[in-house]
Amino acid sequence: MKAVAINGYGTVGKRVADAIAQQDDMKVIGVSKTRPDFEARMALKKGYDLYVAIPERVKLFEKAGIEVAGTVDDMLDEADIVIDCTPEGIGAKNLKMYKEKGIKAIFQGGEKHEDIGLSFNSLSNYEESYGKDYTRVVSCNTTGLCRTLKPLHDSFGIKKVRAVIVRRGADPAQVSKGPINAIIPNPPKLPSHHGPDVKTVLDINIDTMAVIVPTTLMHQHNVMVEVEETPTVDDIIDVFEDTPRVILISAEDGLTSTAEIMEYAKELGRSRNDLFEIPVWRESITVVDNEIYYMQAVHQESDIVPENVDAVRAILEMEEDKYKSINKTNKAMNILQ
């Protein structure tokens, strides 16, 4: 049973902590917070040992009546590995601390690939992180792209990908972000960061462009893929049906928007209404000459969570076969495929 520390108990960290706790070969030995807020209290209610990320703030937690087990430094002493779920840019700064402590670490997609040196996606390049000291789980959008592009590449050979990414403006709890009434090219030039990020884990030719829109629910992707071997629509459906963490949805079933997909996620009865899988609209799958078209959605708060679990097994050399790790994680988390 491997001991996992979660540095940063926010949108991603709290989900990763719960996913780790569901596994039978690893456990959460502690989570960290910078502020004594409601999430800190909820962590304690869930039975997680709570550590203070900024030592100078220990007294703030004590004043708030929140019991802490120590500082992040203390937490790392108890762990085999740390999953850094801190805000963008903080993880790279924490890397020095992890190196000094001699502890292996997993970072999130907000960090730059160049700063960490290695990126991770369960299906695309699990083996590259096996036994390594540090890796970075690619971003939510990149994870979503890799989930569907990797099996297409394996099955038909990708010549080129062009993807238009419609990004949510903020997560539901981010009251300080927007836009409220605008569509923002992000950036107003090619490429968006998503294409280069895909290339850190999957060796394909890809260009991406993105816009930010005033919604908080999900991202949405419009993907065009030129392939070496032209498939039929049924061939593509078969590939997606056989791909872990990808599900086919249908507008005929009432799933015509990201809002309805999130309603579907609620009906699954999961904590926080998470959708770990990448839903692909069945009706959108089209083949014209040697080009595949399809539309998919990404629940930005949760799709990267199972990848973090697999990354633990890869780095700590707990499982060499990526499919065995994926299946083990999926079963523990009740992932649909």
UniProtKB/Swiss-Prot annotation:
InterPro entries: DapB_N (IPR000846), GlycerAld/Erythrose_P_DH (IPR020831), GlycerAld_3-P_DH_AS (IPR020830), GlycerAld_3-P_DH_cat (IPR020829), GlycerAld_3-P_DH_NAD(P)-bd (IPR020828), Glyceraldehyde-3-P_DH_2_arc (IPR006436), NAD(P)-bd_dom_sf (IPR036291). Pathway: Carbohydrate degradation; glycolysis; pyruvate from D-glyceraldehyde 3-phosphate: step 1/5. The active site is at 140 (nucleophile). The keyword Oxidoreductase applies. D-glyceraldehyde 3-phosphate binds at residues 139-141, 194-195. GO terms for cellular component: cytoplasm. It catalyses: D-glyceraldehyde 3-phosphate + phosphate + NADP(+) = (2R)-3-phospho-glyceroyl phosphate + NADPH + H(+); D-glyceraldehyde 3-phosphate + phosphate + NAD(+) = (2R)-3-phospho-glyceroyl phosphate + NADH + H(+). It is an enzyme of class 1 (oxidoreductase). It is found in: Cytoplasm. The keyword Cytoplasm applies. It holds the Pfam family DapB_N. Its EC number is 1.2.1.59. NADP(+) binds at residues 11-12, 34-35, 110, 171, 300. Belongs to the glyceraldehyde-3-phosphate dehydrogenase family. This is Glyceraldehyde-3-phosphate dehydrogenase. The gene is gap.
